[in-house]
């Protein structure tokens, strides 16, 4: 059995999702952080720039007793034509977990298929699941554990929006998307969760919902 990756919400259960969020809140509120990742090394492979995602992963691994190595796109042999499959094999032979941030989701899939350690999606053109985990953890904190019922997304149908669509299906909440024509979310992702998602083109429908994420 190979490593368990976190590329999107397709292969994670509702129970796993909730337990991760609850564990995150528990660690956040703990005065003494458990050093459960002592001796582990996290590789941050970022072809795209980042502030919040990079810092949060670096702080997290350090708080849990591990360490991190950061590699930008210009520091990798990928820029010289090395296959991403080879990069994945080499890096995973020396690291314990890898966060990949790239502009192409297919790259992430190829990388994970050739990695011997878990791979986490730090952002692709198609999904940004870690952002949704952070958003919904915050919601759970401020509502003291209340289940999410309705979300309204206002803006272009980008990678974060696509991840919200997957989350709606996973957590069984209603997602209304207010998106200008020509900026709709990925059609295949939308179709897979159509029972939980509606796409609006007028602001009146969007404003009737209870939670707005811009």
Task: Report residues per predicted region.
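Conserved small/polar residues in nucleotide/adenosyl-binding loops
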Residues: 212-214
């Amino acid at each position: 059995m190979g490593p368990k990756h976190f590329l999107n919400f397709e292969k994670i259960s509702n129970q796993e999702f909730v337990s991760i969020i609850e564990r995150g809140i528990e660690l956040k509120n703990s005065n003494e952080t458990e050093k459960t990742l002592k001796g582990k090394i996290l590789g941050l492979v970022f072809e795209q720039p980042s502030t919040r995602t990079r810092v949060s992963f670096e702080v997290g691994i350090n708080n849990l007793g591990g360490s991190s190595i950061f590699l930008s796109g210009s520091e990798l042999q990928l820029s010289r034509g090395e296959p991403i499959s080879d990069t994945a094999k080499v890096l995973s032979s020396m690291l314990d977990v890898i966060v990949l941030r790239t502009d192409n989701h297919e790259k992430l899939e190829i990388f994970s298929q050739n990695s011997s350690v878990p791979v986490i999606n730090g952002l692709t053109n198609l999904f940004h699941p870690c952002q949704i985990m952070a958003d919904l953890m915050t919601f759970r904190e401020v509502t003291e554990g209340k289940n999410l019922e309705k979300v309204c997304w206002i803006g272009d149908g980008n990678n974060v929006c696509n991840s919200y669509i997957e989350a709606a299906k996973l957590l069984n909440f209603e997602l209304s998307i207010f998106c200008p024509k020509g900026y709709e979310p990925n059609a295949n992702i939308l179709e897979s969760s159509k029972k939980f998602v509606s796409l609006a083109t007028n602001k009146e429908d969007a404003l009737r919902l209870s939670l707005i994420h811009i």
